[in-house]
Regions:
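GST-like domain detector, emphasizing the conserved glutathione-binding G-site
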Residues: 1-9, 14-123
Length: 124
């Protein structure tokens, strides 16, 4: 069975979960708390040496990290990924935009609001 190692409040993990639900694919979710060092254990690093979530355990026993790589893997052969070359390129265009031009700002703002105390000078 497809297994996702992820953190429920992570946007990158959420989009993988959303794709799995949209495709009605069975999966197992393993909650990993990166704030408690769970991505730095020997066991986790053997799956993903970068120590990041999400990481997917594929049916053949291999591991696939990075949310957009997982999304592309899941979408292959499904209605989520167009059959034509330009359509697939446009999907990748949006995935690159989301990951590199949009997500960094959202993730930083969310982390500041969620993890820094209200009186922290770093919140300014």
């Amino acid at each position: 069975m497809f297994t996702v190692y992820g953190k429920s409040d992570s946007g990158n993990c959420y989009k993988v979960k959303l794709a799995l639900e949209q495709l009605s694919l069975p999966y197992r979710w393993v909650e990993i708390d990166s704030t408690r060092g769970e991505t730095r254990t020997e066991s986790f690093l053997s799956m993903n040496p970068n120590g990041k979530v999400p990481t997917a355990a594929l049916e053949d026993g291999s591991f696939l990290p990075e949310s957009n790589a997982i999304l592309h893997y899941l979408a292959e052969g499904s209605p989520l990924l167009p059959a034509d070359r330009l359509g697939r390129a446009r999907v990748l265009q949006w995935m690159f935009f989301e990951q590199y031009s949009h997500e960094p700002y959202i993730a930083v703002a969310r982390s500041i609001l969620r993890y820094l105390p209200p009186d922290s000078p770093r919140r300014a």
